[in-house]
Amino acid sequence: MGVTVQDICFAFLQNYYERMRTDPSKLAYFYASTAELTHTNYQSKSTNEKDDVLPTVKVTGRENINKFFSRNDAKVRSLKLKLDTIDFQYTGHLHKSILIMATGEMFWTGTPVYKFCQTFILLPSSNGSTFDITNDIIRFISNSFKPYVLTDASLSQSNEENSVSAVEEDKIRHESGVEKEKEKEKSPEISKPKAKKETVKDTTAPTESSTQEKPIVDHSQPRAIPVTKESKIHTETVPSSTKGNHKQDEVSTEELGNVTKLNEKSHKAEKKAAPIKTKEGSVEAINAVNNSSLPNGKEVSDEKPVPGGVKEAETEIKPIEPQVSDAKESGNNASTPSSSPEPVANPPKMTWASKLMNENSDRISKNNTTVEYIRPETLPKKPTERKFEMGNRRDNASANSKNKKKPVFSTVNKDGFYPIYIRGTNGLREEKLRSALEKEFGKVMRITAADNFAVVDFETQKSQIDALEKKKKSIDGIEVCLERKTVKKPTSNNPPGIFTNGTRSHRKQPLKRKD
């Protein structure tokens, strides 16, 4: 079985704290060259010994970390600690790095015990068998949890707030009582609705007399139809006046409730009585016109013009059996002769829109047919048509430029080696570059150097991959970039008139007339 993450973390923490206690000057070898450290600031002296948190300082780089631990060697050696918890996770690129968080207690000679939390990030080295510290942060945890106790000042403030709130509530109640009294004083007087009632009764009196008077029709004269218009006018005035009476009754006060109810009942009875009488009068007039005859002995037909809008009413009337009680029929017989026809209800009037819909109903139902369009099948193109669809020089040139923009990387060259591209080698000797690369990555077969870059061929692919993952390396104080090598762009030796894709340019030639 291989080594687990738990084994790596426990072994690292044991060696780290053991090296801190035995030889702090060699503790910097655990860190990477660009590591960052946040540790206890041993140089600052706290004024209060009862403080449970110590100041910290940040150090960057392996050399500065080595100087920090060497300067405070005696203080670091006296460290004693106890670990309570250890947590760890994979992190970083491809989850190869390890994140460790340890909590516990530590102290030095002559100091109290401090609670701390220390976090590490371990990065695997190039060979993969060792790890380097890239980040190290320590944080001291405060232990000052003070209980909350009520003092005299806080109690006095709470009492003052309660007294202020009680005074404000009293003011609000007093203001609301004054507003209610003002509203009662501004309430409407009772005498005003009485005057309105009298006017209502006066207005309804003429309408009742007008509706009760029946039109007198002479059967010998065919021009008795305008009487129906007047009766219709009377019937229309009654509902309008009664609507106004209902609105005025709603304004009345509660004290006159009983009086208004009686008036409403009387108005409703008048409403029901008035339309029935006017309808009977209008029907009698219409029937009289239909039964009358002209002086020359010809009967009046529906096709002949009639004054006013009466023709529409005559054409629309259909006989309907009246649903009237026996008491009403007896009353009507007493006032009218026994030969009077039975009343017929007026059908609803036809509007221009309803007539238009009835006329066009047949047309609309017939024209609801749907038309389906079938797309013709695509025919294969002839070879002559394909020639004209070929791109011109600009299209081919743009296509070639797009293909050239995509870089092609070389993993293995023709000699079987694995090349990489190194940028920023200005002022760096070839021998030092070779020795540094072979020491960290593996055997170098060939180096092709220029002014500010170099191409290095490794023997194995593993060395190439490790170098590319490193990305940057510092050699003799010069930082170089390790990148992938691209393939050389092919030179075009095609003759003029032929493109890189092998197609020829098509020139238009003048058409020759056939004799």
UniProtKB/Swiss-Prot annotation:
NTF2 domain ranges (all copies): 8-140
Residues carrying Phosphothreonine: 336
Pfam short name (any one): NTF2
Chain coiled-coil ranges: none
Keywords on record: Phosphoprotein, RNA-binding, Ubl conjugation pathway
BP GO terms, sorted: negative regulation of mitophagy; protein deubiquitination; protein retention in Golgi apparatus; regulation of ER to Golgi vesicle-mediated transport; regulation of retrograde vesicle-mediated transport, Golgi to ER; ribophagy; stress granule assembly
Residue positions, PTM Phosphoserine: 187, 282, 340, 398
Assigned GO CC terms: cytoplasm; cytoplasmic stress granule; cytosol; mitochondrion; P-body; Ubp3-Bre5 deubiquitination complex
Subunit field text: Heterotetramer with UBP3; contains two molecules of BRE5 and two molecules of UBP3. Forms a complex composed of CDC48, DOA1, deubiquitinase UBP3 and probably BRE5. Within the complex, interacts (via C-terminus) with CDC48; the interaction is direct and UBP3-independent.
Protein's recorded name: UBP3-associated protein BRE5
Organism phylogeny: Eukaryota, Fungi, Dikarya, Ascomycota, Saccharomycotina
